[in-house]
Amino acid sequence: MYKQARPHQKRRKRSGAEVREEGLAAARGLLLDRGPAAVTLANVGQAIGMSHANVLHHFGSAAGLQSALMGSMVRDLTDALGNVVELMKTDAAAPRAVADRVFDAFDKGGAGPLAAWIILSGDVEQLDPVRAAVRALVEAIVGQSTDEAAPDRVRAAVLMMAVSAFGDAVIGPHVRDMLDQPDDAMRDLIARILPLFLIPTGIPPAAP
């Protein structure tokens, strides 16, 4: 006897761009609800009403899907930090707001566990889309400054924030507990350090 498909599984003709967009949205939902292990081609296909083979065609592999998701999350972070330099210069509360945006992306947004999953898989080539997104983030922030030394300082600031937010998302709760520190201890520390990167003499240049 014919059994009618459920509405969310109904298949329709979609462009490649639409499939990727819907697939990444579904992957993000799976990441937040069930963790990195749930971000598979089969689960995404089920969520968007496509076969495993069709999803495979658009993302190449489960690792490719996870990498594309990570890259899209970094691009979203770039958009969220669109006017960061001006804010930092005019708003005393901006450093903490910037820290919260970055840390939220790695923690509540799931980027921290996903990055750890990709790295521990050993397939580091899957970080290439992330590399492009991170460089775009640096360029977006550098583009807001007229200081010749801004590129070096921005790269250093992004390095500091990204590594700190990643570590805080993965192991931060346990380390904070060992040291009797509040939940926002690392965010507060980064917020206090971050303004130094806007001052030409705030951070000594790296040794040659």
Where are these regions (language model features)?
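C-terminal peripheral helix-coil segments that are non-catalytic and often amphipathic
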Residues: 1-7, 104, 136-147, 167-208
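Short, Lys/Arg-enriched anionic-surface-contact patches
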Residues: 11-19
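Phosphate/oxyanion-binding loops and surfaces in catalytic or ligand/nucleic-acid-binding neighborhoods
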Residues: 72, 76, 105, 109, ...
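Amphipathic alpha-helical packing segments from all-alpha helical-bundle domains
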Residues: 77-81, 122-146, 152-159, 188-191
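Hydrophobic alpha-helical connector segments
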Residues: 68, 79-112, 151-154
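Short alpha-helical scaffolding segments that buttress acidic/His motifs in well-ordered protein cores
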Residues: 102, 115-119, 158-161, 165
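Amphipathic alpha-helical segments used for helix-helix packing
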Residues: 104-132, 173-175
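Helix-turn-helix
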Residues: 19-22, 26, 30-64, 68
